[in-house]
Amino acid sequence: MRVLLCGESWVTHSVHVKGVDSFTTSTYVEGAGQLRAALAGAGIEVEYLPGHLVPGQFPGSAEQLARHDVIILSDIGANSLLLSPDTFERSAVAPNRLRELEAYVRGGGGLLMIGGYLSFAGIEGKARYHGTPVEDALPVVIGETDDRVEAPEGVVPSVTAPGHPALAGLPASWPRLLGYNRVTAKPGAAVVVRCGDDPLIACGAFGSGRSAVFTSDCAPHWGPPEFLDWPGYAPLWVNLVTWLAGQA
């Protein structure tokens, strides 16, 4: 099984002010380590495309995407798929990769979107997946404005479809999460786990393919240590990817 994992990285640019002087530093961070390890530990081949490489290297056609059984978008906004260097820097005509991703799923591929500040609608609405072909392929409706639900006190997920393959072998009790993106399940979607009244995990069919969402994060800060260390962490992602690939 082959997975293309996109996003889940960032650069922090800091300004340090000391008296009348200031200087800047930059730090590059990848947050996908535990997710990648969970999938690799189950024998799943993971190709990782960090956020800064997505605009230039994300596949440009449904046929190229079909080399992978499942595509995962995690904390990477729609603009990074729409604006390739060819278009943004050289004004060249290029494929609409959101449409190609929709065609990939419709043709039999699997798509998972994981939540974060640049997922779904995202912070200040900047992820911008509302009204796109990717939203068409997902089992949820995405809002137009900032959809973050911050829960510093922690929110405990509740299982609503215990028999779904995504939950096979998982512990009955779930750890707290510190936030998620608020979405609405489409008619016919299976809402497997909720945070309050909102979907945390939703799954559905689209054309000949499958899609799913996990509306919280696979990494900090919405994913606290108790979630990352939870015995169900690795099985959850393996189950989701296996289901999306049509193997469960």
Regions found by a protein language model. Give the residues of each.
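An acidic, glycine-rich "communication" segment
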Residues: 8-18, 32, 106, 110-198
